[in-house]
From Swiss-Prot:
Biological role stated in the UniProt entry: Involved in the de novo purine biosynthesis. Catalyzes the transfer of formate to 5-phospho-ribosyl-glycinamide (GAR), producing 5-phospho-ribosyl-N-formylglycinamide (FGAR). Formate is provided by PurU via hydrolysis of 10-formyl-tetrahydrofolate.
Residues given in the record as ATP binding sites: 110, 151, 156-161, 191-194, 199
Documented EC number(s): 6.3.1.21
Residues covered by the ATP-grasp domain: 115-305
Binding site for Mg(2+): 264, 276
Protein name: Formate-dependent phosphoribosylglycinamide formyltransferase
Enzyme type, top EC level: ligase
Catalytic activity, as annotated: N(1)-(5-phospho-beta-D-ribosyl)glycinamide + formate + ATP = N(2)-formyl-N(1)-(5-phospho-beta-D-ribosyl)glycinamide + ADP + phosphate + H(+)
Keywords noted in UniProt: ATP-binding, Ligase, Magnesium, Metal-binding, Nucleotide-binding, Purine biosynthesis
Gene Ontology CC annotation, any one: cytosol
Family: Belongs to the PurK/PurT family.
Length: 390
């Protein structure tokens, strides 16, 4: 009989959105104490956490003071908008940052993760260039070629991303990128617009032993860089899956922190092209709440808590479709829920965000079926029935 005893830990969640909320659900199943932090009151994860605080996580001293005061066993970032300097200093003092402060820093900056993948590890990416001065914009753009994408060096959920087809639109895209940029860096990344066949997420669990475990690829679609729908399994050639796993292993061997990673790729013909990486549960991975025997949130916890991870298996073909607000509201409510839930094997998750904004993700539909096409159709139909009302 094993002498190992699991002792419940205190987890501090930095960022309390919908992904954090599901992480809290799984953490509470394991008897963990969870404290949630965000910049606004009543964020989704706060509604389930043992305690919560509203602070400016981008302020180094404020963040350091609060973390020291709470003295958690693990600090688990869920967002990019936080002081990396605070995390690095706290890690040096012995605080456990998940997966580690270096990884959080690299993945929150598009230039750092792109340089690591392309220049240091020689992993195939789209052509790219950095621009830190508006006077360089036209020259660098001509080197990449049109159409191209302009993105802030630091942002999330597709904010500030633009597809530019001609040089006359460069300045507008530049201004939009800077307006939606996080952090203090004034700069953008110009990226070749790939005419890809499809894109996917490879959820990868990095154990404390250094072993990598791969979930089945998740197909997804985005609009302006923001997730719209996802499905699992994805019908793709095994040789392409193997290539994506090889690339992922190279990156994670360099980053070397335990937890789950959402690694995004494009496929163009027989090419697999690295896109982005998040060191935490991924929005496209919400499909695993119904598609896998162990969902991505529980996998994240098991990985950094050094708990066993047995075989990960697919339960049934599954799909998601997000519920997007088309209006502003300080007291959002929802119509169409009855009709949405009439479809078989379909669930609706309302995130519980206290306010609605145009384009804001307010919920997600999860659907399963023996036929993946039917699962996707039902997720789409159900999501269309739900409307945000004031």
């Amino acid at each position: 009989m094993s002498s190992f005893k699991f002792i419940p830990k205190k987890i501090l969640l930095l960022g309390s959105g919908e992904l954090g909320k599901e992480l809290v659900v799984e953490a509470k199943r394991l008897g963990l104490e969870v404290i949630a932090i965000d910049k606004y009151e009543n964020a989704p994860a706060m509604q389930l956490a043992d305690n919560s605080f509203v602070i400016d996580m981008s302020d180094k001293e404020i963040l350091k003071k609060k973390i020291k005061e709470l003295n958690p066993d693990f600090v688990v970032p869920e967002i990019e908008a936080l002081s990396i300097e605070a995390l690095k200093e706290l890690e040096d003092e012995g605080i456990n940052i998940v997966p580690n402060a270096r990884t959080v820093e690299i993945t929150m900056n598009r230039d750092k993760i792109r340089d690591l993948a392309s220049k240091e590890l020689n992993i195939k990416t789209a052509k790219f260039s950095y621009v830190f001065n508006v006077d360089e914009l036209e020259i660098k753009s001509s080197e990449i070629g049109f159409p191209l994408l302009i993105k802030p060096l630091m942002s999330s959920s597709g904010k500030g991303q633009s597809l530019v087809n001609r040089k006359e639109d460069l300045l507008l895209a530049w201004n939009d990128a800077l307006k939606n940029s996080r952090g203090k860096i004034v700069g953008v990344i110009l990226e070749e617009f790939l005419n890809f066949d499809y894109e996917f997420t490879l959820l990868t669990i990095r154990k404390t032993s250094g072993e990598n475990i791969f979930c089945e690829p998740i197909g997804h679609e985005q609009y302006k860089g923001d997730y719209q729908c996802s499905w699992q399994p994805l019908d793709m050639n095994q040789s392409l899956i193997n290539e994506a796993r090889k690339m992922t292993t190279k990156i994670l061997n360099n980053l070397n922190g335990s937890g789950i990673y959402g690694v995004e790729f494009f496929v163009r013909g027989k090419e697999v092209i690295f896109s982005e990486l998040s060191p935490r549960p991924h929005d496209t991975g919400m499909v695993t709440l119904v598609s896998q025997n162990i969902n991505e949130f529980e996998l994240h916890l098991r990985a950094f808590l050094n708990l066993p991870i047995p075989n990960i298996s697919l339960l049934k073909p599954s799909a998601t479709r997000v519920i997007i607000s088309d209006k502003e509201s300080n007291t959002p409510s929802y119509s169409g829920l009855n009709e949405a839930l009439e479809l078989e094997n379909t669930k609706v998750l309302i995130f519980g965000k206290p306010t609605a904004k145009k384009g804001r993700r307010m919920g997600v539909v999860l659907s399963t079926d023996d036929d993946l096409n039917i699962a996707r159709e039902n997720a789409d139909k159900s999501a269309l029935k739900i409307k945000i009302v004031s």
